[in-house]
Amino acid sequence: MSKVASIVDVLQGKVAIGETVTVRGWVRTRRDSKAGLSFLAVYDGSCFDPIQAIINNDIENYESEILRLTTGCSVIVTGKVVESPAEGQAVELQAEKVEVTGFVEDPDTYPMAAKRHSIEYLREVAHLRPRTNIIGAVARVRHCLSQAIHRFFHEQGFYWVATPLITASDTEGAGEMFRVSTLDLENLPRSENGKVDFSQDFFGKESFLTVSGQLNGETYACALSKIYTFGPTFRAENSNTTRHLAEFWMVEPEVAFATLADNAKLAEDMLKYVFRAVLAERKDDLQFFEKHVDKDVITRLENFVNSDFAQIDYTDAIDVLLKSGKKFEFPVSWGIDLSSEHERFLAEEYFKSPVVVKNYPKDIKAFYMRLNDDGKTVAAMDVLAPGIGEIIGGSQREERLEVLDKRMEEMGLNPDDYWWYRDLRKYGSVPHSGFGLGFERLIVYVTGVQNIRDVIPFPRAPRNANF
């Protein structure tokens, strides 16, 4: 019995010329020659390229099955690995046996039958779109990046912590949260004042899907020193844009005894590590993106890993923008949150490199960010990258209980709702820092794919929860 091999192993020369091997996958194309040969391009998702299988018409099921094969049919091909005389790949399979495990019922109505589909159409058939070149490449890059992130933190001595998806806390204080409830919507229990009585709900109180694992992560950082979370988060933000999802993944490290400067260094080291990994491990997919999606993909990543990060205070960044002579769609003044056009100007035109903007006005940042001595700004940072703008947001956390309480009061938050978070400041409080990286935003940057809905398997967005 021949050994089963992935197509990537065969194409990369891990199977010797002359060895008989079995590959299993799906037909991308079939073409027939007048000389009684059929050529199947078979892929299994292990790499970008398919392998070519050459089938003689003397194979027993040639007339009955091979000539019926169309795009999407599943096959098991056993054959000898031979050198390929054609350009494009070094080896091909001289088929000795082809087992058809599944035909496409009606090739004329198979959604993936056409050679080219619009990316918008593919969203409507998200259950089949992994079979396309572009979404298959995105999936492999996504896997590579996630593994590189875990590897980076493991090598740096971090512990991965699983933070809850159901929470009673609003980390961002923005109120854009999905409610979790088992109450009967047709017959809601109400208290004497007419409000919904959440004490009768499953958790005995209001609960929501988390917008961030940060607050829970901080509790473990204040015991294990260096931790990170990596999981799904949810925002009930009614934004139908190419940059927003209702469900997305976040990478959130937290480090005890770390300053804002330590935080910026960690962000730089992590980004460069994962970009080096994807350049080394997914060259085939990046070359596809470079050819068909964004010609600057590889150059952008190479420039990033070879750049020193610039750093600038928010106040100085506002000054740079005001003196730039450039007319921005959103006017610039001290106290505004930088828009994408401002961020990209700083990274692409002014610094021409990644840049860390730090020390933002307190009024535009979250309650947990450490108040600076000037009383007007907080120790917050954003990492801006050429080609996309903000890619990471983080801060040194407020470790002083009285200052934290005052910030909560200013923002209309009830300290009692955060009693456990406040406890961290009562019992051996330490300076600590962390950041959040939107994982899908990272994939957009790496692949050049413009719409964030195309870099997550099943996008969740306003009025869209199919599949």
Swiss-Prot record:
Annotated localization? Cytoplasm
Q: List, alphabetically, the PROSITE patterns matched.
A: AA_TRNA_LIGASE_II
Q: Which reaction does it catalyse?
A: tRNA(Asn) + L-asparagine + ATP = L-asparaginyl-tRNA(Asn) + AMP + diphosphate + H(+)
The UniProt entry's coiled-coil ranges are: none
As given in the record, the signal peptide range reads none
What is this enzyme's EC? Answer: 6.1.1.22
List UniProt keywords, sorted A-Z: Aminoacyl-tRNA synthetase, ATP-binding, Cytoplasm, Ligase, Nucleotide-binding, Protein biosynthesis
Q: Which GO terms describe its molecular function?
A: asparagine-tRNA ligase activity; ATP binding; nucleic acid binding
User: GO terms for biological process?
Assistant: asparaginyl-tRNA aminoacylation
Q: Tell me which Gene3D superfamilies the record gives.
A: Bira Bifunctional Protein, Domain 2, Nucleic acid-binding proteins
Respond yes or no to whether keyword GTP-binding is given for this record: no
Main location (coarse class): cytoplasm
A cellular component annotation (GO) from this entry: cytoplasm
The top EC class is ligase
Q: Which family does it belong to?
A: Belongs to the class-II aminoacyl-tRNA synthetase family.
Relate the assembly described in the record: Homodimer.
Its name, as the record gives it, is Asparagine--tRNA ligase
Species name: Haemophilus influenzae (strain PittGG)
